[in-house]
Amino acid sequence: MQIDNIINPDVDSQIKKVEDRVQDQMNSGNEVFDIKVDLLQYMRQSVFAEKGKGLEIEHKFHFQDIEEQDCLLMQVPNINESGYYSGIVGLKSWIDKYHPELRVAIVDPVIDYFFLNPPDKQGEFFNLFNTYSKQSQYWLLYEHQQIFDIAYGFVGRYIEKAKPKFLGFSIIDGNIDATLAIAKLIKEKYPEVKILVGGNGVEVLDFGRLPNANYRTNEYTFIDAIARGDGEMTFADILKSDWSEESLMSIPGLIWNCNGVFIHNRMRANIPMDALPIPDYSSLEDNYYYKSVYQDTKPITMSRGCPYRCSFCSVPDYIPEYRYRTVENVLEELEGWVKKGKKYFFCHDSIINGNPKWLKELCEKIIERGLDINIGGNVRLQSQMRDIETIRLYRRAGLTKFITGFESYSEPVLKHMKKYTDVEGVREIFENVRKVNEENKGTKYEFPLLFGMQIIVGYLNESDEDFQKTLDFVEEFRDCMAEIVTCSVFLLHQTLLVKWRDVEKQYLEYHNGVNFTTKWNTPMDRLRRIEQAEETFKRIGIPYSIYNRGLYLELKEQQEKEQQSNEEIVVIDPIIQTEEEPIILFEDLNDIPKPQYKKNLI
């Protein structure tokens, strides 16, 4: 591929084509079909919702202006984590503050490519690109020209201009395959560049806390080093290493490739949260995806990990220890942004009320210092929120959007999930929000506090009755909700499978994480419920996003094909058949003569 033909001659005309395609899609009224294969849908919707306010679709390519660097950092995007920049921004900010002599730059070659070449969101390439249905089979991406274009035409362009010694990839559970595919191609073309991998996604590799045995690290000899745990100090040590065995052995938290064998060093202690510098996102402010997702909102991180252990959630496996910054440290960051004219913030924490007393103190200090801000973040429904004064405090401090793992309104389902199980308490929380929003009308707090709902459809012990309770609750409290952030058809992961089947001795017919049956539901039950949920969301007029439906539709299509094959296609065993006998296909197996023919289904 001639990269100059893509980047240089007429970028404006290509951007115009992107705008036209997106506008056609928006005008058509097409809704999000399945987020698992749709990276850009949300971005496009956000852009066009704001276009009337003067937001232009722009994206700056840094191929030409990037200077030589010691290391380039990138993360292959995945729709499940909109704040995917936070990890690599944290690494660069650490280097800038504590090791300014090192040159590190963040690049986003995949978004460069997708900006000019919007993918077929229901195509095979993008399905493979987002790690879901064929986990660990990264080589399947090599059947598609796009992965070569991304690696050689875009990532390679940065390498040739910046001449880095290192290329670092940050991985999450949904981008591992595309990362491996790109990293291998880069190593083959640029063998002198050291390939580094870090991020929470390393815990999915075969040695991790949430291991997938199919991710066999010893086969990834194109990777030079893996950072495990808090990566800031490990990353700095890697960049300063002379790459001798003695030097590499001395770096805690490092897993490194020694002539094809990976050596696991001792783990590194966690970094004190207040030692982390304020993340600097300035190098991304002219990035199409970043601008479209965040617009004028500033991402912040107040904590790492989560103190709870929801049955379906992997966060505690990735980050076992929950810890948070001091209130004063967070206030210092907020005040710094306010002085720069910023007032909208979104917290990338897994949970902002993991310590309710800490959040109460933060809110009180925000009010005390007169900070006029708006904050959104992930919130767990808790007993403290049954006190209406708590909700009033949150709103006065600027908390206006709670993304909450509501999941279900069934007590048995919530109990097995290890969620807040008091459904009457949940109702009281929503009633409190409704009351506070009503009493704030006509005041400076008139902008309502709203929930961004997360719902799981088809959990292990969810019956049709349980599911209907959830839909009824959503409809009843529609006025307290901004959107259905995620409505996910349930996928069964290995840890929960073992608990359900082997520890609890519950009935389970299991084929894979999509194709499983319990006493309460089947795969087709779950698919039917997600369709029913969508009908409800449309009827009550709430924005929504569906996750994992495509995987269930693929299963349905596969089962229908198998059924059709079993019913219609019967061939005659060639050993029994003679030259004089005709070849006959029987649609009805009962019509097959016996014993002359042996049934052989294909």
Language-model features: locations:
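Short beta-strand/loop segments at the ligand-binding rim of alpha/beta enzyme cores
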Residues: 190-199, 372-376, 449-451
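Glycine-rich beta-alpha loop elements in corrinoid/cobalamin-binding modules
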Residues: 70, 94, 103, 144-267, ...
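N-terminal [4Fe-4S]-dependent radical SAM core
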Residues: 34-37, 41-67, 257-299, 571-572, ...
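C-terminal accessory regions of radical SAM enzymes
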Residues: 3-10, 26, 34, 72-82, ...
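Radical SAM [4Fe-4S] cluster-binding motif and immediate context
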Residues: 274-448, 457
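A short, glycine/small-residue-rich beta-strand->loop->alpha-helix junction that serves as a flexible
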Residues: 77-86, 171-176
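Conserved Radical SAM active-site core
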Residues: 53, 97-100, 109-141, 145-164, ...
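Structural recognition of alpha->loop->beta junctions
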Residues: 209-236, 393-401, 469, 473-486, ...
